[in-house]
Amino acid sequence: MNKIIKESTNFSRYLRTGGVLNSLRTTSKFVYINNNSYLTHGGFDGNVATIFNISEFNYINSSAKGSLLTYKSITFFCPRYFKKRPLGRHAKGKGKSDEKIL
């Protein structure tokens, strides 16, 4: 169980910072999704990203907090991450999509 929570927590950190986490580049990926189709991290202390699409996912179990899934790829929108991007014509990274695919 610790491994699942750790990977879920790292995934939320990836969403907030835009970093790359090798721990999620594995054949078995775990993620918690609450009942409103939002990604949450291991502590279930808030919504992190809206899920658009999950490919080849396997349902593991569910609780009042949400569902636990394994997946191959996932498309999401993270308002916390993209909100930090500076605006204006001198902003770095302009023109990038608001979606990321893992």
Swiss-Prot record:
Domain of life: Eukaryota
Full protein name: Uncharacterized protein YIL086C
